[in-house]
UniProtKB/Swiss-Prot annotation:
Organism: Mesocricetus auratus (Golden hamster)
Biased composition annotated in UniProt, kind: Low complexity: 48-92, 109-134
Name of the protein: Homeobox protein Nkx-6.1
Gene that specifies this protein: NKX6-1
Modified sites of kind Asymmetric dimethylarginine: R189
Domain notes: The C-terminal domain contributes to sequence-specific DNA-binding.
DNA-binding region: 236-295
Disordered: region residues: 35-134, 294-364
Database matches in InterPro entries: HD, HD_metazoa, Homeobox_CS, Homeobox_NK-like, Homeodomain-like_sf, HTH_motif
Biased composition regions of type Basic and acidic residues, renumbered to the chain: 304-317
Tissue: Pancreatic beta cells.
Stretches for region Involved in DNA-binding: 306-364
Length: 364
């Protein structure tokens, strides 16, 4: 039994060092300093006669590795010290290989208790149980190493790219969306003010060019203005842009003064209102169309009203002329044709009178 335990120790240490994850975990555990003492409940030990079998199943420290925490390695003949490793390694960190393998929650204790429970076990059964115990301990150590790597911040951030000192720093957030930068760009593009344009008086009302609250370069590319959507057929669907009340008020005030804008005027108005030049251009086109329709309707109404007034005045003048001719006294010596025409116009009203007059003339 002692020979088997002595042979299993180097085999287990060689198995631990042969796998890269366990070797890396073991070296990391050696580099750590003890932060707090590990307190574990002592492992249940069997009778004194089975101490050799339990010691053969317990792992031994790997060859050629120094003991972390300044602990002395156990002596070769001290088998009683191998039966209780948690008491001697109480000052070490709880993340070492020996601490992980000697925890009571691992299947090491159950595997170690099997040969100790049968006092009449043979050497072959103890060696097979020891090899199974070492395999299960290696699997448990690999799982613990993976869990520790996943729980540590370094393991979570290991896959992220790192920026070296040679890479340029990121630009400041106000470089691209800055009203001052947009103002400098606009002044550089259109250096002349609107009042200095040849042949044009200043057309903007005073509140536009004095930094109104809606004058912001970030408002020129808002998603709700001129955004493009897709309908059910997958075709591009242009939505109608929406403007604020202040923008519409400024556009209306400018349209009252001029119906057409030059290129620099349109650019400055678009910048002052936080709009694009195309939006201002389209708005003025639509506004001119609306104004033409309204003006044409007003002109048609005025013409119709004027025509009706002219007809009324013409009818009134004709009636006045007829009344003047009718009110003139009849001359007996005048032409009979004129008298006949006047009588024909008023024959309905004076039919009986004409009959009596003709009879009187015939009798005479």
């Amino acid at each position: 039994m002692l020979a088997v335990g002595a042979m299993e120790g180097p085999r287990q240490s060689a198995f631990l060092l042969s796998s890269p994850p366990l070797a890396a975990l073991h070296s990391m555990a050696e580099m750590k300093t003890p932060l707090y003492p590990a307190t574990y409940p002592p492992l249940p030990t069997g009778p004194p006669s089975s101490s050799s079998s339990s010691s053969s199943s317990s792992p031994s420290p790997p060859l050629g590795a120094h003991n972390p925490g300044g602990l002395k390695p156990p002596a070769a003949g001290g088998l009683s010290s191998l039966s209780s490793p948690p008491q001697q390694l109480s000052a070490a960190t709880p993340h070492g290989i020996n601490d992980i393998l000697s925890r009571p929650s691992m299947p090491v204790a159950s595997g170690a208790a099997l040969p100790s429970a049968s006092p009449s076990g043979s050497s072959s059964s103890s060696s097979s149980s020891a090899s199974a115990t070492s395999a299960s301990a290696a699997a448990a150590a690999a799982a613990a190493a993976a869990a520790a790597a996943a729980s540590s911040p370094a393991g979570l951030l290991a896959g992220l790219p790192r920026f070296s000192s040679l890479s340029p720093p990121p630009p400041p957030p106000g470089l691209y969306f800055s009203p001052s930068a947009a103002a400098v760009a606009a002044v550089g593009r259109y250096p002349k003010p609107l009042a200095e344009l040849p042949g044009r008086a200043p057309i903007f009302w005073p509140g536009v060019m004095q930094s109104p609250p809606w004058r912001d370069a970030r408002l020129a590319c808002t998603p709700h203005q001129g955004s493009i959507l897709l309908d059910k057929d997958g075709k591009r669907k242009h939505t109608r842009p929406t403007f604020s009340g202040q923008q519409i008020f400024a556009l209306e005030k400018t349209f009252e003064q001029t119906k057409y804008l030059a290129g620099p005027e349109r650019a400055r108005l678009a910048y002052s209102l936080g709009m694009t030049e195309s939006q201002v251009k389209v708005w003025f086109q639509n506004r001119r169309t609306k104004w033409r329709k309204k003006h044409a309707a007003e002109m048609a109404t005025a013409k119709k009203k004027q025509d009706s007034e002219t007809e009324r005045l013409k009818g009134t003048s004709e009636n006045e002329e007829e009344d003047d001719d009718y009110n003139k006294p009849l001359d007996p010596n005048s032409d009979d044709e004129k008298i006949t025409q006047l009588l024909k116009k008023h024959k309905s009203s004076s039919g009986g009178l004409l009959l009596h007059a003709s009879e009187a003339e015939g009798s005479s």
